[in-house]
């Protein structure tokens, strides 16, 4: 039985972010729809050919998405929210963009669909909306068209579909409450139709993704898999595909299904290959996810070979990435600035395809010399001075319980802060960043390329900070920010100023829609060689009598939004970052900055997928935040910001952070998230986001007032702040001014109404 290679998916955006540029040009009205579609076709063709040349036997088709693959599935099923529907019921690419970005077919504003994290990754999906009695039909044939494209190019392919049970699990009920699982019988005919169309095209295998099978699902949801797959059986071979965790706890459910193969993530799960082999039906194919699709590290192929070799020849076997390579940068070969030693430790998506080919060849032949050669740099890394810092390890070992305790409880601190800042009721602020204009980006780029000297760069940044302060004072905001003109990305900026990180030139990965991020890579112990944010915060504060917030990205978020080391625990990395940023808090305070925001938007998304593993993670995650913040004096107000969050199941931990003020993203969920804070009787101050910064829509004064009144029904008004959902980096100045002016006006109206 010859072993084959395949990937579960490939990055969509292009090596030079071609998809992002084409999307944004189309949205701005600068290019035609046909030009956008052409870019998509070219990217797909290139990526299929690149994977094939790298040694992939079965190419994924259907992993490409114009915005998000869950949203693509919604369109496939005809699941379009009423507010985004065309009058004639037709569906096109503009429908898809309206759902993701927030527009009605008329061009009028309409709330975008909710967006949240894809399991525990840094990718976001558009949450499907379900209503009672909803109808489904095949309305969007993108998958079939792309299958035809790939077949016309002569490729051997494996279409990819998001499975029906996971699709329902990922969605939310809108309107009258009901059990969304009851819709399963209604969506299955569409899946049957799609599989029939694939069978007509001669497709042998379909990858059907059911990552919900790695979760601790309610029994009713586990029970739903059997009837669902009974309905889908018989037209093509189905590779039931799971990832991000192991499947052993749900294996009894899985082995009862009428599928022909199972993909398991052997990186992030604890599944034992021998046990899987023993328990799976003898005629099933096992797809072994041996190469990590979520990181940038070169794999120890000798270890992978040993992990799987015992079952070679005993059952049909494929080797694969653990999950889609969507979460990895595309190509290491274009990284020209990484030094040779560090570069030898990495593998990006194309190199991971090459790793799979090496592994396949060794497993098929029994010859392992190439694996040993490939894995040699990994042995060298274990002893590199770039990795270990004795001073950091010593400081980490010396942490005590006192290091994570503020001097006094919140009630005492709040009195000191009220006396210091004398803020009005409904105080207004923003989350941190202001629009990153072409001028700002050009300034940073010129400095980075050496076309601008340090003095001129600093003069330019200072001018943008000054303008941000002037704008905020003109708008009448109460607590100001410096606008972060000097920062490219909230994690990358800190990583650049901390020892232990390295950066890539083209290591882009998709975050959502057209947004891409270039995560730093943690290669060693982390420390702060010098202050990072103090100079610009101090300068901004010198321009105004109003308080200016110091802005830090928190330790758990820096960890979660970086590619972490694999040789130490995530807890170790988080606490090393916390100690480095603790020194930054002390320096900001000494420089006269009275309000310091420590953003932790990633705290919840870092949760393990299984609830039984949550407590240990939350314990060290909260401790890391507190180590970071606890050096602050009582009169220094510590803020934190979180977004894309569901809080009700971690409220104890949110409260345990002991931040004086928490700002959260709530507008897309119509203040639903505040239910958690009300039920918990959250004791500190809260800023519920009053408008969605991911949408270009400008909220009206009335809209914001209505949201704030709704918030005040749940949280005492004296503890409420007024702010947008998130930073304003991706917006333009005209819409930012208009939205903030309406926000400030709404706050003033509520003060007068008291």
UniProtKB/Swiss-Prot annotation:
Note accompanying the cofactor annotation: Binds 1 zinc ion per subunit.
Annotated pathway: Amino-acid biosynthesis; L-methionine biosynthesis via de novo pathway; L-methionine from L-homocysteine (MetE route): step 1/1
Disulfide bonds: none
Catalytic activity reported: 5-methyltetrahydropteroyltri-L-glutamate + L-homocysteine = tetrahydropteroyltri-L-glutamate + L-methionine
Positions bound to L-methionine: 431-433, 484, 599
Residue numbers binding 5-methyltetrahydropteroyltri-L-glutamate: 17-20, 117, 515-516, 561, 605
Name the UniProt record assigns to this protein: 5-methyltetrahydropteroyltriglutamate--homocysteine methyltransferase
Single annotated GO MF: 5-methyltetrahydropteroyltriglutamate-homocysteine S-methyltransferase activity
PANTHER family (alphabetical): 5-METHYLTETRAHYDROPTEROYLTRIGLUTAMATE--HOMOCYSTEINE METHYLTRANSFERASE
Binding site for L-homocysteine: 431-433, 484, 599
Taxonomic classification: Bacteria, Pseudomonadati, Pseudomonadota, Gammaproteobacteria, Enterobacterales
Any one GO biological process: methylation
The UniProt record lists the keyword Magnesium: no
Active site feature: 694 (proton donor)
Cofactor(s) needed: Zn(2+)
HAMAP family found in the cross-reference section: Meth_synth (MF_00172)
Record family assignment: Belongs to the vitamin-B12 independent methionine synthase family.
């Amino acid at each position: 039985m010859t072993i084959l290679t395949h990937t579960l998916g490939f990055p969509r955006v292009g090596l030079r972010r071609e998809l992002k540029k084409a999307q944004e040009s189309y949205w701005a009205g600068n290019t035609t729809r046909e030009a956008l579609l052409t870019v998509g076709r070219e990217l797909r063709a290139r990526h299929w050919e690149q994977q094939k040349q790298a040694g992939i036997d079965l190419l994924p088709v259907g992993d490409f998405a114009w915005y998000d693959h869950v949203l693509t599935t919604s369109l496939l099923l005809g699941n379009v929210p009423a507010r985004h529907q065309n009058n004639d019921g037709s569906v096109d690419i503009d429908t898809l963009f309206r759902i993701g970005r927030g527009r009605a077919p008329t061009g009028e504003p309409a709330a975008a669909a909710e967006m949240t994290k894809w399991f525990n990754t840094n990718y976001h999906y558009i949450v499907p909306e379900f209503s009672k009695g909803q109808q489904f039909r095949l309305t969007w044939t993108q998958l079939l068209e792309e299958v035809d494209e790939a077949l016309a190019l002569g490729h051997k392919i494996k279409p990819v579909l998001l499975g029906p049970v996971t699709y329902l699990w990922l969605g939310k009920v809108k309107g009258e409450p009901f059990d969304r699982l009851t819709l399963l019988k209604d969506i299955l005919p569409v899946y049957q139709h799609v599989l029939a169309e694939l069978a007509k095209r001669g497709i042998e295998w379909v990858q059907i993704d059911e990552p919900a099978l790695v979760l601790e699902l309610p029994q009713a949801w586990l029970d739903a898999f059997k009837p669902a797959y009974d309905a889908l059986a018989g037209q093509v071979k189905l590779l039931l595909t799971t990832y991000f965790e192991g499947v052993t706890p749900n294996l009894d459910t899985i082995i009862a299904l009428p599928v022909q193969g199972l993909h398991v993530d052997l990186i992030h799960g604890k599944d034992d290959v021998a046990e899987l082999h023993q328990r799976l039906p003898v005629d099933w194919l096992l797809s072994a996810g041996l190469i990590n699709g979520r990181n940038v590290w070169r794999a120890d192929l000798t270890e992978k070979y040993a992990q799987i070799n015992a079952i070679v020849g005993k059952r049909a076997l494929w080797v694969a990435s653990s999950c889609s390579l969507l979460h990895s940068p595309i190509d290491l070969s274009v990284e020209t600035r990484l030094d040779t030693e560090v570069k030898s430790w990495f593998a990006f998506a194309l190199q991971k395809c090459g790793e799979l080919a090496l592994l396949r060849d060794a497993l098929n032949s029994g010859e392992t010399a190439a694996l040993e050669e490939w894995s040699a740099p990994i042995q060298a890394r274990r002893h590199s001075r770039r990795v270990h810092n004795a001073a950091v390890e010593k400081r980490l070992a010396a942490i005590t319980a006192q290091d994570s305790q503020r001097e006094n409880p919140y009630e005492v601190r709040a009195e000191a802060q009220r006396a210091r800042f004398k803020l009005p009721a409904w105080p207004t602020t923003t989350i941190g960043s202001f629009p990153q204009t072409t001028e700002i980006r050009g300034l940073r780029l010129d400095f980075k390329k050496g076309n601008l000297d340090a003095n001129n760069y600093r003069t330019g940044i200072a001018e943008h900070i000054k303008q941000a302060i002037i704008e905020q004072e003109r708008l009448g905001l109460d607590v100001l920010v410096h606008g972060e003109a000097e920062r490219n990305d909230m994690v990358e900026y800190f990583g650049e100023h901390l020892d232990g990180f390295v950066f890539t030139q083209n290591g882009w990965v998709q975050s959502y829609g057209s947004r891409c991020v270039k995560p730093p890579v943690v290669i060693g112990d982390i420390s702060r060689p010098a202050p990072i944010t103090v100079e610009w915060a101090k300068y901004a504060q010198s321009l105004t009598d109003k308080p200016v917030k110091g802005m830090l990205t928190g330790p758990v978020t820096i960890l979660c939004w970086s590619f972490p080391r694999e040789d130490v625990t995530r807890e170790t990395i988080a606490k090393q970052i916390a100690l480095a940023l603790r020194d930054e808090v002390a320096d900001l305070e000494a420089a006269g900055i009275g309000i310091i925001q420590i953003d932790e938007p990633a705290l919840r998304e870092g949760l393990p997928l299984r609830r039984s593993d949550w407590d240990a993670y939350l314990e060290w995650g909260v401790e890391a935040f507190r180590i970071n913040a606890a050096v602050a004096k009582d009169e220094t107000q510590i803020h934190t910001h979180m977004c894309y969050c569901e809080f009700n199941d971690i409220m104890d931990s949110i409260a345990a952070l002991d931040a004086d003020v928490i700002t959260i993203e709530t507008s897309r969920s119509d203040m639903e998230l505040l239910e958690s804070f009300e039920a918990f009787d959250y004791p500190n101050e809260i800023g519920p986001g009053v408008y969605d910064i991911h949408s270009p829509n400008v909220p009206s004064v009335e809209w914001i007032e209505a949201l704030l009144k709704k918030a005040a029904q749940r949280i005492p008004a004296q503890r409420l702040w007024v702010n947008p959902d998130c930073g304003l980096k991706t917006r333009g100045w005209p819409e930012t001014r208009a939205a903030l002016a309406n926000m400030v006006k709404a706050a003033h109206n509520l003060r007068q109404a008291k």
